[in-house]
């Protein structure tokens, strides 16, 4: 990974920031400045993205179906395969240590919790969202996991669907990521939309041909993104689909994140 997120607190001096960027250049990393928040830029935006992927498998999509849709969009690796590679247990422990970052939706990251309960934590145990042969990273279907997730969905009152499309998978995962990015911009955690795009194209496998999540949002139109967020918010957990105020404002003005940043820069 070439990305190096450089995190600035209120007490961090400019000389320290300059030294950090110089170090990034020396070790051939791409430095991006972030303010302090849970997950900084990259992991904070990955949280809703992965939330939707996990919810989709509870609704009846297979892990391969979810990951294939994201990889066809251009992501370097589907998010469920990423969890298997990193370890399902890592995310479970992070959420346990930071319960305030959760949701009132009982399905929130339940897929991870179910797999963790079976010690199916990914490649290091040979089973996770997928099954792996010893010494291999090749993904194979894991029917036991899918059956257990279907049982969990039934307990949660989540109906199994057969009509989940590739378009829905991409929209739910990518639009929720963009929405979080808009919140990050408005809070000043990231200085500019381009910084978010660099984080995602340099460190999180977002397709360079699409420019990054915020550039992609500008390209397809913020009104399109907002309409999708509002649509899914009506039939999913509304709390998790609240549109970012900045996204609503710019969509109403037929604006873009890039133009918003340019206007702010001119004001100094």
Walk through the language-model features, giving the residues of each:
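N-terminal glycine-rich phosphate-binding loop for ADP-containing cofactors
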Residues: 1-268
